[in-house]
């Protein structure tokens, strides 16, 4: 399909090679974070996350029942500063949270201590300051720095069953169950080598599971009945009889079934059918004989008590033998735990055997008989060893562990998972454990061990969920409130007298909440410095999923399984995009179409299939909902009516690929590209690349630096405009309308809605610094008179071209060696690329300096600096700050600053100087801000902040006046446009109505009943208009008044907006304590492509520029055009990224077809528009879904010319991932573009002019310049700073350090016998302090370097030994000989 890319989003046509027409639009890429934070702040009027957290902590009661604190309501304030102000002034973009708290004073019954009534109620509003607010671009401004909170992928609360190999016994599997809460104690169930079932709480010492059941209040008999079927045995005439139950004989029968009289009614070894069993019951079979040999290994379910004496003969769980059976015969009946008859596990019986001994010992030490109390005490001792305990405290402790909502929270998700897994029907709102949960978990684990249950996969996306910003913030708020709750309870206990005077504010300290939240944003692992290199890096950063962070995994201990791609990732998590290195697989990205539901589970979209027919109904399913369903891939052949063509389809079911009948298929993938994430879906022909290289390609696109002029790729995938649509860099129209005025800095759009006309104003941001020091600049892409729709991109941001992402440049490349310069992935570049600034980028650096108030006086920003030459400060203005436009070189002063020197008695020379030059010269010292060693560029902006109460300097006043003038001009322009529009509408209204009296309008006279010409009406002014309107009917006068009132209201709104902006401008600067002035200087640096810069394609094909060759020396084509870049052909086969070859083929086709369109322009014949239309139609008819002819025919001549001009530089293609151009389409394109079918061409050597022996693959590839720039990495040191302790040179470019001469380098010098060089390296070039000083002296005087001394390292060692109380003496060699 020839996709116009929805003309509202960009002005570009692309030939689209999709196989499948898109059913739904790609959802907003940032909706997960937006929705999550909106829920937290309650922006859609439901119960907010904040409300829920407050309600979970409040009310707080006084232990003595005197007071209670209740939460009433909360209200969110408005931000005090704008986003731009916060970034410039280093503030946090935040709001105040106002919460209403009610303090109730109770009347107490003196005898019972119970509450009997309310004495007093007080309500108070308490402010919680600085709750960071999400910006409209889904980031946070913390202390002036833009940050992103990454989504966390963590283990879902609920129950999970696992099977692992035993660490102690070979070839034995160990089964475990875990109940995982969101907050509270984890509960582990596990078998040991002897098949005893144990339980652990929070990985403490294990106790038999029956101990926990007893602590929960269950008696021994209750536990037996819960886990084992009980069989009653009747004793009759020395025979053991039991009731006949056919269900006991479902499998083959081990013994003969005999009736009461001993007659065999069914023989052993034969199967008892249902029919036969019914017949036996009909025949009156009620009792059957229970064989003694079977009875011998059974356990008693209930104790057997002697009827006469009342003493217990045998306790429950006694193992029966012949002697015991003989004694039991005297009883009429007894119960046995029919444990092993149905293959039921003996684990619980074994656990009873284990806990019996422990309870006996506890009985003696604690003097308590109740086994339930003893079990609670045992659990308390395991959890808190060494602490004294009483039974009530132990019971309360066990209850608090799992049943107290303050301490334990499963969450709605955990409850849903528990109910689903264990078949429970506990209501959703019960988020603590129940006894039934614990019993059912133990039962299910026994089933799992016996091969009947289902083992869980912890990496299944049904067992992992996403915590987004809203939930993470709610958790932090809960932590802060929990600390505050503890503090309030402590205050309650210390309150004795004057309870009537206590106010909520006396009890609540809101700082505890603020500090917890700010700590999370500044130091949390999930709050990260936003990657702003280009729009793609920003969007993918906000879509990132991290398994690390608080409550997540630790990267050092994360195994291979958790990092691996899981079958459930399909359509939910991108299998390609993840970092290389130790975080591989732990940090992922959401797939393009994936959504996250309310419970935090990732959903993938599918279309429903009914009886082999694909419907248009799209459903989003989680990994759990998808289980067991047959899902066909998007590439399944479907006819025009949507019926699946082939009878058997390759489908997926639970991660396995199987062959299914078309009638069995229930779902089909929405599209082929749903598997991968945003970055991977930007790689054309991704299906032809090896996954490892695609991973590098995805990651390197995020590192592409925005270039001076952006150009969209010739070979795109259609995702470019989606990223531009959702990235905040582009300016999008809030409301539709007509472009009234456009210049480099602003766009004015005049529109009309239900209320009437309006003017929207958009300001273009210029030369702003991003987090990665790249240049943020916007430029309009609309013209005056253009009609725009709401949401349309009206201005491109950095790395954007006509509303599409453009992170690199289209370059003509040849795969050929060039004199060894492209050995090992190196890149040979033509000088033309540098001359035309193709890969030039602008970077902005911020340098700041502050003037402080010191005890000796105040520091001053000034041009008057002591001991500095006049020419060194010539570029500074009168205020001592570099002028805008100044070319900065390393070592130049950016801002002059002098600091007062402490008073010292002056020397005679100083006294003389003071007498000559005045008082000041001696008192101050130069503390100016200098340009660092690698900083070179132009000053583009200066920001000056002055503390309230201190005088602003001239530069700050001029800067303020300039900004004020810009605001005034913008306001004036908007008012003018409003006035013009008002007059136009009034004239249009009056020109349609007839006059009620004779009037002279302009130069013409009109009689009553005539209508005035609009041209004459436009000549009159406003004052004449007020009298003229009276000559019209009352209806017209009313319409005129309505129109006038509407425009007056709009002007009032504009005035209010303008006043608000002025107020912001005039606000006092907030600076840290002690700082009186802060100056920020912004320097823009132009970085041209250099040898050493890193470049890459989109397929993981990266390399370093090795040489820049004059254009005339580069290989050239038969038409004389030289190639831009020469790449090594050996970089392709072993890397298996063939996508780059296909991309360069299609890119060349685009260039050649573009040349053909340019030829039509150049010929400019009479019917050239007709020819253009025919050519574009011919190109667009090649893709499979060629249904664009109507669209191209419907284009006006002007629209067609716009698209054709764009295509003349290269026809743009869109080849979505997994739906790329096929062989037939390629051959058609090659013929149309007049390219040889092998895609190769003859090339000539630029230096000799000779034809190159072999035909060479030449194509057009989209190349990126990455932010690993040589200018920022190259570094050299002669002398510089030394480390204080070791006296060795410091390391790193930032500290102006030296190169490390390590162990292996020492070996190299040793191997060559370079003894003197080695000695120099280890002494005077390193840490021989005296040696380096004397060497420097000798070198300056031209003498020989003297002998080296003792390195400082030796003294450090001796001092270390001295600190261990070892005396170290150093003897000279000569002294020793004596």
UniProtKB/Swiss-Prot annotation:
GO CC terms: DNA-directed RNA polymerase complex
Top EC class for this record: transferase
Stored CDD domains: RNA_pol_B_RPB2 (cd00653)
Membership in a protein family: Belongs to the RNA polymerase beta chain family.
PROSITE patterns: RNA_POL_BETA
Alphabetical list of SUPFAM superfamilies matching this protein: beta and beta-prime subunits of DNA dependent RNA-polymerase
Species per Swiss-Prot/TrEMBL record: Campylobacter jejuni subsp. jejuni serotype O:2 (strain ATCC 700819 / NCTC 11168)
Single GO MF annotation: ribonucleoside binding
Listed InterPro entries: DNA-dir_RNA_pol_bsu_ext_1_sf, DNA-dir_RNA_pol_bsu_external_1, DNA-dir_RNA_pol_su2, DNA-dir_RNAP_su2_dom, DNA-dir_RNAP_su2_hyb_sf, RNA_pol_bsu_bac, RNA_pol_bsu_CS, RNA_pol_bsu_protrusion
Family matches, as Pfam families: RNA_pol_Rpb2_1, RNA_pol_Rpb2_2, RNA_pol_Rpb2_3, RNA_pol_Rpb2_45, RNA_pol_Rpb2_6, RNA_pol_Rpb2_7
Higher taxonomy: Bacteria, Pseudomonadati, Campylobacterota, Epsilonproteobacteria, Campylobacterales
Nucleotidyltransferase recorded as keyword: yes
Its biological purpose: DNA-dependent RNA polymerase catalyzes the transcription of DNA into RNA using the four ribonucleoside triphosphates as substrates.
Known catalytic reactions: RNA(n) + a ribonucleoside 5'-triphosphate = RNA(n+1) + diphosphate
Complex and partners: The RNAP catalytic core consists of 2 alpha, 1 beta, 1 beta' and 1 omega subunit. When a sigma factor is associated with the core the holoenzyme is formed, which can initiate transcription.
A GO biological process held by the record: DNA-templated transcription
UniProt superkingdom: Bacteria
This enzyme's EC code(s): 2.7.7.6
Protein name in the entry: DNA-directed RNA polymerase subunit beta
Membrane-spanning intervals of the chain: none
